[in-house]
Amino acid sequence: RTEDQIAKLERVKVDLVAPPMVHKHEQKVGPEPRVVEFRMTISEREIEVDRDGTTMHAMMFDDSMPGPTMVVHEGDYLELTLVNPATNTMPHNIDFHASTGALGGAKLTNVNPGEQATLRFKADRTGTFVYHCAPEGSVAWHVVQGMHGTVMVLPRDGLKDPAGNALHYDRVYTIGEFDLYIPRDEKGNFKKYGSSAES
């Protein structure tokens, strides 16, 4: 589709919610694609990770770890505005495994503190995909500090069982497994850092 054709499509603004919850969405949609708009703000802040008061400097999408789950339908255009507030100290971006080219958008969404970027791509295959921050040279660090989440691309006519019968879910949650990496000092205590950059 051309930019003019995309501009005429229905636009749907989505308010993201923190996992394990997932934003409201339709399970089936009509044949005409839509532009589904999301906005995420990057946060860098200290968080407490256990009952003993252990902390880490997290980097997060929309202040949650993992980041919010985004739901679109096959053929829709996912449009994300990624905001890196001026109060942050590091550059960030987003790599969508549901997208192809330009490192899943990472090369097109590099944002320094005080900047924002908007990326739009066509969700052309169904499934559940990861997204994460992918700055050159420090992908793993940003991911283990919390910058990852999920995109779910549903079939336009909804989910079906192997026999082709329609499936409907009453609730949907984000479930995943990830570890936090917090080094220990020579006495065995978890280290504490003054900033994300120091960690």
Per-region residue spans from a language model:
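Acidic-aromatic/histidine active-site loop/patch
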Residues: Y169-S199
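N-terminal, post-signal-peptide metal-ligating segments of extracellular/periplasmic oxidoreductases
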Residues: R1-H92, F96-L103, L108, P113-Q116, ...
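Short helix/loop capping segments that flank catalytic or ligand/cofactor-binding pockets
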Residues: E48-D50, W141-H142, D161-P162, P183-E186
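Interdomain boundary/hinge segments at the C-termini of tandem beta-sandwich modules
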Residues: I42, V151-P155, E177
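Extracellular/periplasmic metallocenter environments
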Residues: E79-H92, A98-D161
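Short edge beta-strand segments in beta-sheet-rich domains
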Residues: V35, H142-H148, D170-V172
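Active-site-proximal beta-strand/loop segments in catalytic clefts of secreted hydrolases
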Residues: S43, V83, A134, E177-L180
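Non-catalytic, glycine-rich low-complexity segments
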Residues: K28-V29, T41, G164, I175, ...
